[in-house]
């Protein structure tokens, strides 16, 4: 028997012990370490989708496929940079959902970290201007 999106989310949050909110459109929201907000939704009861705002200071990335499967795509929504990903609900179990969510959160953290260190010169290494 196929697990519904609602059942999958209930199992996930119970397993992870995370506090979450769900709105009237069945969009689940939770925070990671107080600085990353992740939204999880299901499109037409077929596609599970993950979303997170990246922050205004991150440049747009045109790498549509990325390093992960399912792909994590950086784009814009309402003028703000976001990271999103989706995969079919069919066959998605709790362990796969947890692993996907963990990779997604790791990707967000790496993108934010690389942006924070991108323009901070290391005082111990010389800067070469060409």
From Swiss-Prot:
The keyword Chaperone applies. InterPro entries: Tir_chaperone. It comes from the Bacteria. One of its GO terms (biological process) is protein secretion by the type III secretion system. CDD domains: T3SC_IA_SycT-like. Keywords: Chaperone, Plasmid. Binds to YopT. Functions as a specific chaperone for YopT. This is Chaperone protein SycT. The gene is sycT.
């Amino acid at each position: 028997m196929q697990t519904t999106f609602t059942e999958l989310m209930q199992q996930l949050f119970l397993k992870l012990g995370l506090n979450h909110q769900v709105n009237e459109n069945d969009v689940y929201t939770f925070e990671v370490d107080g600085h990353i907000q992740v939204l999880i939704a299901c499109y037409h009861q077929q596609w599970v989708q993950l979303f997170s705002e990246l922050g205004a200071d991150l440049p747009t990335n045109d790498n549509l496929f990325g390093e992960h499967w399912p792909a994590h795509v950086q784009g814009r929504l309402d003028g703000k940079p976001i990271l999103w990903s989706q995969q079919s609900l069919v066959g998605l179990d709790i362990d796969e959902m947890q692993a996907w969510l963990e990779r997604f959160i790791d990707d967000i953290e790496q993108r934010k970290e690389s942006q924070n260190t991108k323009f901070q010169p290391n005082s111990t290494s010389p800067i070469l201007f060409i």
